[in-house]
From Swiss-Prot:
Keyword rRNA-binding in record: yes
Record's GO cellular component terms: ribonucleoprotein complex; ribosome
InterPro entries in alphabetical order: Nucleotide-bd_a/b_plait_sf, Ribosomal_uL23-like, Ribosomal_uL23/eL15/eS24_sf
Species whose genome carries this gene: Chelativorans sp. (strain BNC1)
GO biological process: translation
Protein name per the record: Large ribosomal subunit protein uL23
Length: 97
């Protein structure tokens, strides 16, 4: 897989209070492409950040229905990946991709 494809798999780091707490357990949370699979996510993180990944868990957050000036709209679904790193490995997501 090329580096360009790796950048298509990982959209952005998810920086929330919950993901900050997960970093204490050697886990990093990323927003990923909806069609990305666990092996693709693992390969992309290992290639882009030069770390060893021991596990990948994924979830899909369904978009909410929102109203703006009487018009009903819907937010997009978001797929997140919780990546567990090997002992001694770390990624500083604050610096960006």
């Amino acid at each position: 897989m090329t580096d360009l494809r790796h950048y298509d798999v990982i959209v952005s780091p998810a920086i929330t209070e919950k993901s900050t707490m997960a970093s204490e357990n050697n886990q990093v949370v990323f927003n990923v492409a909806r069609k990305a699979t666990k092996p693709e996510i693992k390969a992309a993180v290992e290639a882009l950040f030069n770390v060893k990944v021991t596990g990948v868990n994924t979830l899909v957050r369904k978009g909410k229905v929102k109203r703006f000036r009487g018009t009903v709209g819907r937010q997009s679904d978001v797929k997140k990946a919780i990546v567990t790193l090997a002992e001694g490995q770390s990624i500083d997501v604050a610096t960006g991709l």
